[in-house]
């Protein structure tokens, strides 16, 4: 019996369905038109979200992936359509987000001729993706898609790019589903060395002042429960990286807060006082380590990670434990002895009190003056019972949101960590509403970041995406202005912002909105936002020259934090 003959575009549709895809984000164009034509017959199974710019498609796919744990998919045309996704691909690579970008390409016979909208997408994206492949034949579609999804989701997740030549979209081919669960040259889950585990166990059992650094690898490996079991048995306090904040509930007695330049005082100071440092699924980013020459020199360092290239890359490691966090944490928990570190844990308290008295109380509970950003974040977090998904943009809004929003559920934070991409928030929040339609999605952004991808309000309007947008408007590029104030003698070079009327913009898109200008209106505005079905834009006019504190100045040791500026 002969196999069914279908086009390469139809093979793509069936392959996506075979991978379990139900939602994709994209924008049509000439070189991808046959694929969109095939998609027309699959709209009952594949929900395509039409964005307003291809960068938005990539970020929406990221938001979808981060909250759902599934692979995000975007579909774009060649040339500028493909290059518009580059920022999102790079962002997904450094933040280990599984997305598959499918881009149209000129026909194979035109490759290398500088044809209309031809770009060497494979060449451009190889350094910023896990795998980049050009499909030139229709018969390769099913195999390429299966391989792409396997690579994107396995091991340390990341972006994959498929460059789909137009002739391969229209040519006919035999089709049958393909499954890929092994690639000879690719080891996504390396075997854990039992000797390394034994060495780690010995160090943990002997430790008097241990500290765990919790990274996003815990979330990516679905190891939240294993982490909690481990730290509770070992009685070890934790500091969380920006992307690892929701891996352990914020109110857990062992969660001592955020690490990094604008993190909490306790875990940053204690990094340079602990005797055993256990890094779990984190990469010792420069914003976490500060000055490397003085970073945790007194400690024995244990590093748990699935990616061997991260171990020893930035910080010398005494005991490397290779493997996925779920398995390695389970192994350690089984083998360690129950511990009590009451005195060590109590030593965090003075730093918590100092930070509250000198920073948090003033930022979150001011008695007078303009509204503070931290005050807004705390109020929204409380109003959502700390159960919402937090999506942030980049800058002061990001740091304030991540400092003062509280988490009770895993996979609850979506932000641009390593790349620091302004404009990330709005499209990523749209993606998050499709990835977890059962949860409230709160998108915190500044006036600078919103205007970078503001056209995606059109997507919000069309899809009736129930994203709750909290625009903290200070009429500045706030983070750059803060650095100009602290390190450049208050020379505010091109950081003041002239803004449009956001209420009129929201109205033009048919999005409910409210502007809050006084503290007395804040809680009412938040309640109106949360009680409104569908999207809502809450503009809060915040203090113009507010600063994010504490702060480790660039080039300083991680335990040196400014409490005022």
Question: Whereabouts are the PLM-identified features?
Answer:
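Thiamine diphosphate
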Residues: 102, 110-117, 268, 312-314, ...
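Short acidic/His/Gly/Ser-rich catalytic and metal-binding motifs that mark active-site loops
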Residues: 35, 171-174, 247-250, 355-357, ...
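Active-site nucleophile and cofactor-binding loops and adjacent substrate-binding regions
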Residues: 27-29, 48-59, 74-81, 136-137, ...
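Conserved short loop/turn motifs at secondary-structure junctions
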Residues: 215-219, 365, 446
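N-terminal alpha/beta PP-like core and its mobile active-site loop of ThDP/TPP-dependent enzymes
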Residues: 2-343, 383-386, 459, 466-469, ...
